[in-house]
Amino acid sequence: MSGTARLGRNSAQTPVLRSLPVPDPTHAGPQPNENRTGPLPAVTIALPVLDEAAHIEACLRAVLSQTYPRIVEILVVDGGSGDATREIASTFPGVRVVDNPARLQSAGLNVALREARGDVLVRVDGRTTVAPDYVDRCVSALTRSGAALVGGPIEPDGTTWVERAVGAALTSKLGAGPARFRNTAASADWTDIVYLGAARVDVLCRLGGYDEAFSTNEDGELLYRLSREGGVWFDPTIRSTYRPRGSFATFMRQYFLYGIGRAATVRKYPASLRPRQLAAPLLVLGLLSPWRRKVALAYLAVVAAGVGTELREDRAAGAGMAIALPAMHLSWGVGFLVGWLRSRSRYDDK
């Protein structure tokens, strides 16, 4: 059965995007409403959420302030929130709340695909605040690049000490490596990862949507498939801010689960592995080896150098980064090793 049939899309619908020309994909800076020809693609905005009462109002206010003129629906796909997320979302006109019984983000995004009436699906998370021209720039980048998916950088916007420390770790070279999507100053280019972003609904459906076997890293798994379908385009003008986790414990749990998901992706697609992704699991193994003391001292020296750079810009965040970086690396590394073992039986025999 094809992905389109599985997701229940109307096969008679002809996406507007197919009628638009696909210019040179090396164009580095599409502008909103810049020389568009033909009808504008209809857009569905999808928010897969779970217990985001503290952030959903700001998120939806930003979504409802978009400059793009053809947003046909805003779907809040709720995974059974135990707080007031659903009630808050229901108070916004033009917002439709739909159920995600499986609770997972991958399942919630597939619910959005089945419900979508738009030609383009723009994903927004509950902890994210998008710029007013976010959708406009997503559609412009999709049209001009011809990519299967486009997105921009991640920009942490913490207010508490922990949130700022986590944000500093996320955007540092030690935390992010050379990843383009964590650098707001990076130039537009083809890439293997972006933050959230937008994709053509017909392409997503043809690929079968999100893999619901993934409880985390569902976006990374899909991005790998999309990179072979039409490519992933990074545009630094697609701007949004993200509220980091508010405690080191929840941050560590988040990255432990990310590590599990990344390992499952590598098991499924070995070619998706990047050398930098081995650093954290090798660190964990090194700390368990007979050379643990030397490994620990070398690692702490590297962290100290990275923290020193941040201290010159933000003393409080830099000090917190000394906790956030090891928390990030160790939890992700342990998660990767656990995920590697867990996913062995799922993919090794295929």
Question: Language-model segments: what does each one mean?
Answer:
Residues 100-116, 137, 190:
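Glycine-rich, basic loop-to-helix element that forms the pyrophosphate-binding segment
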Residues 129-164, 168, 239, 243:
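Conserved donor NDP-sugar-binding/catalytic core segment of glycosyltransferases
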Residues 61-71:
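Short, acidic, metal-binding catalytic loop of nucleotide-sugar glycosyltransferases
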